[in-house]
Amino acid sequence: MQSIGIKGIGYYAPENVFTNFDFEKIIDTSDEWIRTRTGITERRFATKEQATSDLACEASLKAIESAKIKKEDIDLIILATVTPDYLAQGAACIVQHKLGLSNIPCFDLNA
């Protein structure tokens, strides 16, 4: 019987930072008000040129490095997002293509 598992994890946070102090400049709020109610101090935003699949590819490459494997060792891609690149097409197949892994299954998990 073949086993299944997660060998590595990775993440990618875009470089564009928007802090609570930035919010203070555009709406009637404060860093303290936001932080005490949400715990959030900053948010990260992708550029207009970056899609969800681009962010997922960056995270995937970090996961591959973390697992100390080659990308060809991957047997399945599962992408979980509420913000796919397109409404009618999943982003997992785009990540699959960008990673050059067309011979394995992939699917999106959306909530």
Which positions does each model-derived feature cover?
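Short, flexible active-site-proximal loops enriched in glycine and acidic residues
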Residues: E72, Y86-Q89, N103-C106
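Short Gly/Thr/Asp-enriched flexible loops that form oxyanion-binding sites at enzyme active sites
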Residues: T83, L87-K98
